[in-house]
A protein has these predicted regions:
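A glycine-rich beta-to-alpha transition motif near the start of alpha/beta enzyme domains, typified by
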Residues: 1-112, 155, 161-268
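Glycine-enriched loop-and-adjacent helix/strand subsegments that border the catalytic/binding cleft
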Residues: 115
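Intrinsically disordered, low-complexity regions enriched in acidic/Ser/Thr/Pro/Gln residues
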Residues: 118-120
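C-terminal domain-closing interface element
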Residues: 125-147, 250-268
Length: 268
């Protein structure tokens, strides 16, 4: 039996969305469709149900046929699929995944959606993650009002981050600070000449997820803006077609581009 489908890509991750009823169990369909040698090839198969009391729910199946938690990219792809196929005609709605509702907003140009914004809620910041006395002192160090952008800011999420917004800090000092951080810490240099409302990342030490890094960076700048300028700032960072915005209340929104890559059919 033939199954029609759409394949989407978001941040180099691809997922398949069936456009018709599956002719076989979801596990079997995922194995056949997601196989990159004999099938279409994808990281997962997304199925939707309208029986959830919270609205439409999404379930993700891995290429091995097992049900798996839906990653962020799968949720955004699911939202664009529902909009593209007119299952949902709203640009703002909730989509449940793994029992959790997610607030989504479709970003459109000329009536067509190019990306999806996901409400990530509020950051988890825990001052207790800093094991270094020096790092702890730097976090609470006062900054001169006459030059508020030459500062050092430490913000902790799931991973410790160090953000430098002054251009007068020698690279050796940055390296020594990173050495005092807990394992897995990341350092980033923010452009001191950029608009405080639109900070720009110049360099990053260590591998990290852009969204996590941008969330931490934007939050750091937002906190500094309220402290140094006396008013809370809404801050955005971008990297190509990926955007992160932190509101003055420190609520985080991430916008990622979602592209349709394949529209086709396959016999199952």
């Amino acid at each position: 039996m033939t199954l029609s489908f759409l394949k989407y890509t978001c941040c180099q991750r691809d997922f398949l969305c069936p456009c018709s009823r599956l002719p076989c169990p979801p596990a079997d369909a995922a194995k056949k469709l997601c196989d990159r040698k004999s099938g279409i090839g994808a990281e997962g198969l997304l199925l939707f149900s309208e029986n959830d009391p919270q609205g439409i729910s999404l379930t993700c199946y891995a290429p091995d046929g097992c049900q798996t938690p839906a990653p962020r990219e799968a949720i955004l792809i699911g939202a664009k699929f529902l909009y593209d196929t007119a299952v949902i005609n709203l640009t703002e709605f909730c989509l449940s995944a793994d029992g959790n509702p997610h607030r989504l907003h479709l970003e459109t140009r000329g009536g067509e959606a190019w990306g999806v914004t996901l409400d990530l809620g509020y950051p988890r910041m825990d001052a207790g993650i800093w094991s270094s006395t020096r790092a702890g002192l730097l976090r609470h160090q006062p900054y001169p009002r006459e030059n508020p952008r030459h500062r050092l800011t430490l913000v902790g999420f799931d991973t410790p981050y160090l953000f430098l917004t002054g251009d007068d800090t020698p690279p050796a000092d940055v390296a020594s600070l990173i050495g005092e951080f807990p394992a897995g810490a990341t350092a980033a240099l923010l452009d001191p000449k950029a608009d405080p409302l639109s900070p720009r990342l110049l360099a990053v030490s260590g591998e990290t997820d852009f969204t996590h890094l941008a969330c931490a960076a934007a939050t750091a700048v937002t906190i500094c803006g309220e402290r140094d300028f006396g008013v809370p700032l809404a801050v955005s960072l971008s990297d190509g077609n990926r955007y992160v915005t932190v509101t003055p209340a420190l609520r985080i929104y991430v916008t990622l581009e979602v592209k349709e890559s394949i529209r086709g059919e396959m016999n199952l």
